[in-house]
UniProtKB/Swiss-Prot annotation:
GO MF terms held by the record: proton-transporting ATP synthase activity, rotational mechanism
Protein name: ATP synthase subunit delta
GO cellular component: plasma membrane; proton-transporting ATP synthase complex
Organism, as annotated: Streptococcus pyogenes serotype M5 (strain Manfredo)
Compartmental location: Cell membrane
Name of one Pfam family that matches: OSCP
Disulfide bonds: none
Gene designation per UniProt: atpH
Length: 178
């Protein structure tokens, strides 16, 4: 992706977040974006929208299906994308919208990787640790299970990581023995 394309994507995303923020609709926008991104993942819609083989009329039909229960701001955004023929960039724009919402609201997704599934008590403790250590509000808690960690956990928030896994400790111990 070129710098020009990246700047275009960021401008569209920032504008949408700015409008939603002015109207106190960030939560609704975030829900809309997550639902549409889920559709992208389950249907490979991104490939269809970015393909030159798919006619513009077909792309209009596909995006019209996405307009269902969205907020006014999201539907206006989708109309603007269609009008300016920027469908190929929609997936990246929506990803950038989520990043912008996180920055504006200081609310980031938290990814927790552990060797076993977390209990509700552990999840609430993770949220407390995230709030204290990273000075952010925990957004969605994304839980991953990786038995190779042996024990402990890895918390990842906004490109920052806390790794207390036994696997990492064993690797560090192994390096110290060399």
């Amino acid at each position: 992706m070129t710098k020009k394309e990246q700047a275009l994507i960021e401008q569209y995303a920032k504008s949408l977040v700015e409008v939603a923020s002015e109207h106190h609709s960030l939560d609704a926008l975030q829900a809309d974006v997550l639902a549409i991104l889920e559709t992208f993942v389950t249907t490979n819609l991104d490939q269809s929208l970015s393909s030159l083989a798919v006619p513009h009329a077909e792309k209009i039909k596909l995006l019209t299906l996405l307009k269902g229960n969205n907020s006014v701001y999201m539907n206006n955004f989708l109309n603007l994308i269609l009008q300016n023929e920027r469908e190929a960039y929609l997936y990246q724009m929506l990803q950038t919208v989520l990043n912008e919402i996180a920055i504006v609201s200081n609310q980031y997704d938290v990814t927790v990787t552990s060797s076993l599934p977390l209990t509700e008590e552990q999840k609430s403790r993770v949220r407390a640790v995230v709030a204290k250590k990273f000075a952010v509000t925990a957004g969605r808690l994304i839980e991953k299970v990786d038995p190779s960690l042996i024990g402990g956990f890895i918390i990842s928030v906004n490109n920052k990581v806390i790794d207390t896994s036994i696997r990492r400790q064993l690797q560090a111990f192994k390096m110290n023995l060399k």
